[in-house]
């Protein structure tokens, strides 16, 4: 793998830069589509997301975003080695992100059961919490950059019937903190400060800044289509 990695990172070309998304999240794909981006490749990264002892939520988000980018890099290299990708000479930008919901330093999980989701909602009820979003870019030269965004969200007080109805909707599944602000849980929010797209799953302004810094031609897609 070492020789492949060295060869891969030394190769450059004048061809189009490939955007590789290190996430299979439909929310992140939809957010990228909002700014005219359609990744060339998507890799679902499987990493251990367990927080380290006394790890700050912001540091957790940054660490996981970076680990996802590096994991996608390994997958990309493996596919190239085994003839499953013809992008060996391509310039690439791997984009990865992670979202962490926390009240103070208490990190809320992605619930694995209705009971866990209920505890998240009960904890968020009538309180403010922070959503830490980290976005990471990694290119074929090994250059890696991580940006962190903080958003503050305040929930209304949630009644038992409201929480039960939300749990029955199933919308909490796979969501950091057990809710999706772009869905039915939007009715829970009485105040938000900061990036809305960050709470959904990807801070778009910072993502655009990162891709621009990595010379990805994002704005080339912002052209009106004629019929």
Swiss-Prot record:
It comes from the Bacteria. Its EC number is 3.6.1.9. One of its GO terms (cellular component) is cytoplasm. Keywords: Cytoplasm, Hydrolase, Nucleotide metabolism. CDD domains: Maf. Disulfide bonds: none annotated. This is dTTP/UTP pyrophosphatase. It is an enzyme of class 3 (hydrolase). It is found in: Cytoplasm. The record marks 27, 99, 182 as: Important for substrate specificity. Its main location: cytoplasm. Its cofactor is a divalent metal cation. Gene3D superfamilies: 3.90.950.10. The active site is at 98 (proton acceptor). GO terms for molecular function: dTTP diphosphatase activity; UTP diphosphatase activity. Belongs to the Maf family. YhdE subfamily. It catalyses: dTTP + H2O = dTMP + diphosphate + H(+); UTP + H2O = UMP + diphosphate + H(+). It holds the Pfam family Maf. Nucleoside triphosphate pyrophosphatase that hydrolyzes dTTP and UTP. May have a dual role in cell division arrest and in preventing the incorporation of modified nucleotides into cellular nucleic acids. GO terms for biological process: nucleotide metabolic process.
